[in-house]
Amino acid sequence: MARNAQNAYPYYFNKALDSGVTSAEFSELVTHTAFYAGWPNAFAAAGVLKGIFDERGVAVEDLPTVEEARLPTEVAVPDDALRAAYIAAHIAPASEALQHFTNDLLYANLWHRPALEPRDRALATVALLAALGQSAFFPVYLTRALTQGVTRTEVGEMLAHTAFYGGWGYAIQAAEAAKSVFDAQDAGA
């Protein structure tokens, strides 16, 4: 979804659902994608996914709601204090509105939604960032993913997968960023 490859959506969306991704998880993944790959990409995916859900008999009642209880911060975003400090120091001086939406919408809402396990949300985010060539923020999100239980092997597989769907250049950028994170962890930093 990060690259808006709409012609491939029906095949891959069905494959994901046939492989055990639940309709609720997929719906939540599309919502999450909107924040990292842009709303137009998510809207395109949602249209295709609605058709697939209709074919499979998935009802709106089967999908996550806005009113769901939220996960505690220490579970959803274990590095939230560091994240908030970074946003206050580096984003707020340029855009208080972006700080507001980042804190109150992205983190206080989206990252706390229970329809995706925190480790799965973190892995999806690093996959999106890799496919979009967003290597500047990749280390922060990768560190969170590793903290939430994503393994280095899973990261390696995701990076290899990214090469085919996001392009080799983006996958290599993300691999270099991942190596830096791994090296820092190995050094005890």
Regions found by a protein language model. Give the residues of each.
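Extended hydrophobic/aromatic segments used for targeting, binding, or gating
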Residues: 139, 148, 153-162
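Substrate/cofactor-recognition hotspot
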Residues: 28, 32-40, 168
